[in-house]
C-alpha cells in the first residue's frame, strides 16, 4: 500500500513538471498545436496577419508569433534558429545552404505567391507614366529630376524613397538594374512610412510592395490608396500606355517589376511550422493571397484596377 502511494505521488510530480517542459531536444509542437516564432519580410505583414488570423481560428491550441523585419534580418533569424520559418522574396543562397548542411539540416522552400513592386507618387504629380529605360537611368544615377523625365513637369528635384536599406524591395531594385542605389535615394523604416512620406512630398517617388494598396476589402489599403497615385510602367516599344501592377498583369508577366514570395522552413520534422506552410499552400490560404491583390501560386486571377 505504501509503495503504491509512493509510486502515485512520483507519477503526479512527473506529470506536474513534465506538462510545462520537455527533455532537451524533444518536440513540444505538432502541425496544429504548440508555439513557435517566425520571421517575415515586413512588406508582407498585412497578408501574413490575415493568414495567421484564420489559422489561429482553426487551431486554437496553436500560437505562431511573427516578427516583421527587413528581409535580411528574416534570413538571419532563420540561420540563428530564432525563427522556425522565414517568409521572404528569395531562396537560400549556396553559402546559406552549406551552413544548414553543416548542421545536418535541409530547409525546404515553397513558392506561395507572386508579388509586384509598385511605384507611387504624390496625387498632384502629373507624371504618371515612366519607362523601364528611364527607371534604369533613375536607379543608376543618370536621371535625378522630374524635368528630365518630362520637360513640362512643374517639379524639379526627384527623390526616391524605400522602406529600409536592408529590405527586399531595395535588394530587388539593385539586382534588377545591376547597380548600387544613387545618393538621392533614401530609406525610412516601413512601407506605410514610404506612403506617408510620398503623400506629403510632391517631388518624391516611393517604392513599395503592391499589397499595401491592392486589397479592396482592407480599410488601411483603401486609405493608403487615397493618399497617393500608382505609376504606369512602359516595358517596351510595343507598350504605348504602360501598366499598373494589377493581378492579371503580374500573373502574365506584362508588368515588369515582379518577384516570387517563398516560405523557407528549417524544421527537420512535421512541427507547427510545417502545419502553417501547408495551410498557406492550401485552397483557403491561397484565397487569402488572392484577396490581398497578389497572385497565388496555384489559382487563376482576373484584372482588378486601382480606384
Language model regions located:
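Pocket-flanking alpha-helical
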Residues: 72-103
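Exported/periplasmic ABC-transporter solute-binding proteins
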Residues: 21-60, 67, 71-72, 76, ...
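Bacterial N-terminal signal peptides
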Residues: 9-19
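Conserved catalytic core of two-component sensor histidine kinases, primarily the HATPase_c ATP-binding
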Residues: 116
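Bacterial N-terminal signal peptides that target proteins for export
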Residues: 1-9
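Periplasmic N-terminal soluble interaction domains immediately after the signal peptide in Gram-negative
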Residues: 104-108
Amino acid at each position: 500500500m505504501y509503495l503504491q502511494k509512493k509510486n502515485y505521488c512520483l507519477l503526479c510530480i512527473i506529470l506536474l513538471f513534465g506538462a510545462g517542459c520537455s527533455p532537451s531536444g524533444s518536440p513540444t509542437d505538432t502541425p496544429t498545436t504548440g508555439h513557435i516564432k517566425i520571421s517575415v519580410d515586413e512588406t508582407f505583414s498585412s497578408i501574413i496577419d490575415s493568414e495567421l488570423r484564420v489559422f489561429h481560428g482553426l487551431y486554437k491550441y496553436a500560437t505562431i508569433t511573427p516578427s516583421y523585419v527587413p528581409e535580411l534580418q528574416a534570413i538571419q533569424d532563420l540561420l540563428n534558429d530564432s525563427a522556425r520559418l522565414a517568409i521572404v522574396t528569395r531562396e537560400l543562397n549556396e553559402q546559406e545552404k552549406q551552413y544548414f548542411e553543416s548542421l545536418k539540416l535541409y530547409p525546404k522552400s515553397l513558392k506561395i505567391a507572386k508579388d509586384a513592386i509598385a511605384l507611387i507618387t504624390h496625387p498632384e504629380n502629373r507624371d504618371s507614366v515612366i519607362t523601364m529605360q528611364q527607371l534604369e537611368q533613375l536607379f543608376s544615377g543618370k536621371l535625378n529630376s522630374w524635368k528630365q523625365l518630362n520637360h513640362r513637369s512643374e517639379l524639379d528635384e526627384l527623390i526616391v524613397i524605400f522602406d529600409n536599406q536592408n529590405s527586399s524591395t531595395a535588394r530587388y531594385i539593385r539586382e534588377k538594374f545591376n547597380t548600387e542605389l544613387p545618393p538621392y535615394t533614401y530609406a525610412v523604416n516601413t512601407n506605410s512610412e514610404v506612403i506617408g512620406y510620398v503623400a506629403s512630398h510632391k517631388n518624391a517617388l516611393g517604392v513599395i510592395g503592391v499589397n499595401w494598396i491592392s486589397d479592396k476589402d482592407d480599410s488601411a489599403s483603401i486609405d493608403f490608396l487615397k493618399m497617393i497615385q500608382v505609376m504606369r510602367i512602359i516595358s517596351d516599344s510595343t507598350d504605348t500606355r504602360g501598366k499598373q501592377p494589377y493581378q492579371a498583369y503580374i500573373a502574365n508577366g506584362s508588368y515588369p517589376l515582379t518577384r516570387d514570395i517563398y516560405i523557407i522552413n528549417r524544421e527537420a520534422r512535421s512541427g507547427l511550422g510545417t502545419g502553417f506552410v501547408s495551410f498557406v499552400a492550401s485552397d483557403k490560404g491561397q484565397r487569402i493571397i488572392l484577396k490581398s491583390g497578389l497572385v497565388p501560386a496555384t489559382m487563376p486571377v482576373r484584372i482588378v484596377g486601382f480606384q
